[in-house]
Amino acid sequence: MSDCLGGYDFYDEAHEQMVDEPRFVDRGKVTADTFANAGARVLEINSKTGLYPLYVTYSIFRSRCATCYEEELDDAKLQQLWDAAVGENVFVICKTPMAKQITRRTLAGFRKIQVNAHYFEDLINMMKNKPRQFVDRVLKPRYWNQEGVKTMKFDAVVGNPPYQVMDGGSKASATPVYNYFVEQAKELKPAYVSMIIPARWYSGGRGLDAFRESMLHDHRIRQLFDYSDSNDCFAGVDIAGGICYFLWDENHNGSCEVVNFHNGARYETLRQLDDNKVFVRYGQALSILNKVQQQTTEFYDSKVSSQKPFGLRTYVVPTEDGDIQLRYNKGIGPFKRELVTGALDWIDKWKVIMSYLTYDHAGRADKDGKRRIFSTMEVLPPKVVCTETYIVVDSFDSEIEANNLLQYLKTKFVRFLVAQVTTTQHISKANFTLVPIQDFSKAWTDAELYKKYGLTDEEIAFIESMIKPMG
């Protein structure tokens, strides 16, 4: 929270060791409006243990103390100032009664003082299906027992919302919900919003397309802190695609400071989040992508198949006999041509296929900070089709062209481009938005591609630092 709003931080600047005396982090106006403001109102949505409210309370408590003479600050006065911060500055929404009780205990111990904490019986459902009701209730002063207050105006809304809920499918699949919390936080019309959420929204999909567009085109997002490996933010926690937190400022209308944390390094760029047709995660990649785009008229997202290229679900298996063959997740076997319902013109061509799942666990790099991206890739000869376990990258009349495409996909150059728009464990045509189509009558190497697009030594080194070799 100190990165976005400032306040009193109990860790050193690297956030590796706790310090004996909390250090004050001053982020300028945002800090002056919130944690250094004894009249500020800060709302946390989805408190679990009261850690965020405790941070807020302590920071504002210290600001209240700063207005007093040192000789005034005896134990009674300090207790009074603490209770005032809890009762007047901090407001909390919880998802369960237990979370509410824990939060209250964190802020007040066993003392009976005013703690502005409520829980919603079905918070996620209300955020998703009754957003207006949520906003209206939270903005009513009487909901918080705020006597003499005409309108509840929050200076900041903060939180670590729930990330997903199981969607009840036949397999253990989940639907994201954190987007609803971000949207309703904005609807409360605070001066600032700061939340920590999964970064997979960068790529959209799974109900996140509208949220992605809203975030990328919202020029009130002043800062975005991005961790490609969630372990660098939450030790021991694997979140596919990484994690991010942001600062939304109602009075900001301009570029966003994007801060990437990758492999122990920090890199900052100032840019519009919607500068490109897709959100480019790493600022260091922008110059590379610009060079590629200047020389390219057609990209591979126009060629790659949709999911289920031949209309065959994952559970489809070979038949006892058939006039063609089926590649499925356990191998290959006979299949009947008449059972194929999609891409009939590809059946008799050479095809390059790949698994729809990425190789990297939860999108994480290895210990050296490098990713492989693609897992299974192979060339299917004519009269061989596949289930939806695979996607078809392209089809050709000749084996040579298919083999050359396969080698092209194995280059670090291509996998680097795909990595820029891959924040989930699934590969689809959208992940090939930045990959240029080549002449596949010849083979391509990384050295040739680097030369073709005029990459500098620094740009080449960045690609090599992120992508591992693939034989």
Which ranges hold each PLM region?
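A structural signal for short hydrophobic/aromatic patches embedded in well-ordered alpha helices
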Residues: 1, 103, 405, 463-464
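SAM-dependent methyltransferase catalytic region
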Residues: 1-223, 229-233, 242, 246, ...
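C-terminal substrate-recognition regions of SAM-dependent nucleic acid methyltransferases
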Residues: 152, 230-457
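Charged interaction patches that mediate protein-protein contacts
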Residues: 215, 455-460
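Short, amphipathic C-terminal "tail helix"
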Residues: 461-471
